[in-house]
């Protein structure tokens, strides 16, 4: 099950108490203090785990506590330090304070390990409190308490390219054809219920990661449909690929305008992202001359509209994922766009 948001409770370990002890040996009647220090409590760390892309394991285990430090012993023996807790999260997980929603750390690189809570300091044994006025101190420090925090884990998948489109326009077919991703593909809306990542091998030396999210509908920024819940997963992408469908009721230009507006309402940053456009299902030539005329007319209308808006870096490509036409050209265009885009994580 895909889970991209969960809250958990974390606590570091308490420091161990210092010992009150006196040296006891044969022929030494009044030995001095020899109480050891308590061990420090364990810390709480968060670490990127590249072997997972979901927070589902946290649904059943929401409390994480490091071990307490052990008390000090005689003969100045220090107590054992408490074991740390290491919480492993997917790449792209943000750690926030649950109450204030303030960002604590963004786990956006791998490898990466960050200490969230330090364990309590162990108490000093009575050895430290001997002085001229008190040769046999009977006092030792208690260990300091650990820290506690209620945190929110928010996963934002990291990809180079984010697919954007209405439901059932061919996004899942496209990503499954280009990459190793295997989303469900069927002829009904909202086939894609969760985000999918796929690695596209562009050539012998280059590859990029593509993200497919559930389809967006008009009004998504206000909570309609499924796409709004997953738009955060394309916020980190360096490039957006709009998938438009000539078979829809809206024209190609209208589709792009609706999708762009929903992205801008969700995050103004997304509206500034470099993008390209693919026209899916361009293999429907068997529908006759009327379809071909409609396709050419709407494509020209979209090109003129984008030219007026001043988007020189964008491209428009007709493709067919079923017949695999236009896909090599698409990968080439995406690769070029990523290479000139500083936000890319191109490998």
Curated annotation (Swiss-Prot):
The protein's required cofactors: Mg(2+)
Alphabetical list of InterPro entries matching this protein: G_OBG, GTP-bd, GTP-bd_Obg/CgtA, GTP1-OBG_CS, GTP1_OBG_dom, GTP1_OBG_dom_sf, OBG_GTPase, P-loop_NTPase
GO molecular function: GTP binding; GTPase activity; magnesium ion binding
Assigned EC number: 3.6.5.-
Domain OBG-type G span(s) in chain numbering: 159-339
Obg domain ranges (all copies): 1-158
Keyword annotations from UniProtKB, A to Z: Cytoplasm, GTP-binding, Hydrolase, Magnesium, Metal-binding, Nucleotide-binding
Coiled-coil residue windows: none
UniProt keyword GTP-binding, yes or no: yes
Stored NCBIfam families: Obg_CgtA, PRK12297.1, PRK12299.1
Function (record text): An essential GTPase which binds GTP, GDP and possibly (p)ppGpp with moderate affinity, with high nucleotide exchange rates and a fairly low GTP hydrolysis rate. Plays a role in control of the cell cycle, stress response, ribosome biogenesis and in those bacteria that undergo differentiation, in morphogenesis control.
Protein name: GTPase Obg
């Amino acid at each position: 099950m895909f889970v991209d948001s969960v809250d958990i409770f974390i606590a570091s370990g308490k420091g161990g108490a210092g010992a009150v002890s006196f040296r006891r040996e044969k022929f030494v009647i009044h030995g001095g203090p020899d109480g050891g220090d308590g061990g420090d409590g364990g810390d709480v760390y968060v670490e990127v785990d590249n072997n997972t892309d979901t927070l589902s394991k946290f649904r059943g285990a929401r409390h994480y506590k490091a071990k307490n430090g052990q008390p000090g012993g005689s003969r100045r023996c220090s107590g054992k330090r408490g074991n740390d807790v290491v919480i492993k999260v997917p790449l792209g997980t943000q750690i926030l304070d649950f109450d204030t929603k303030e960002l604590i750390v963004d786990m956006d690189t791998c490898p990466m390990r960050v200490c969230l809570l330090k364990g309590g300091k162990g108490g000093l044994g009575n050895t430290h409190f001997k002085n001229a006025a008190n040769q046999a101190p009977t006092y030792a420090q208690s260990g300091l308490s650990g820290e506690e925090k209620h945190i929110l884990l928010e996963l934002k998948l990291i990809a180079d390219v984010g697919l954007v489109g209405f439901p059932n326009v061919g996004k899942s077919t496209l990503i499954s054809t280009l990459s190793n991703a295997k989303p469900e593909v069927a002829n009904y809306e909202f086939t894609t219920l969760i985000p999918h990542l796929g690695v596209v091998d562009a050539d012998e030396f280059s590859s990029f990661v593509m993200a497919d999210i559930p389809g967006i509908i008009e009004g998504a920024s206000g909570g309609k449909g499924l796409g709004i819940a997953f738009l955060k997963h394309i916020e980190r992408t360096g490039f957006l690929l709009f998938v438009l469908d000539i078979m829809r009721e809206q024209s190609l230009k209208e589709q792009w305008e609706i999708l762009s507006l929903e992205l801008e309402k969700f995050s103004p940053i997304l509206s500034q992202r470099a993008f390209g456009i693919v026209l899916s299902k361009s293999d429907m030539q068997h529908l006759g001359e009327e379809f071909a005329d409609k396709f050419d007319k709407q494509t020209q209308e979209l090109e003129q509209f984008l030219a007026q808006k001043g988007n020189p870096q964008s491209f428009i490509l007709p493709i067919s994922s079923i017949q695999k036409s236009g896909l090599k050209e698409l990968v080439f265009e995406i690769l070029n766009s990523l290479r000139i885009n500083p936000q890319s994580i191109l490998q």
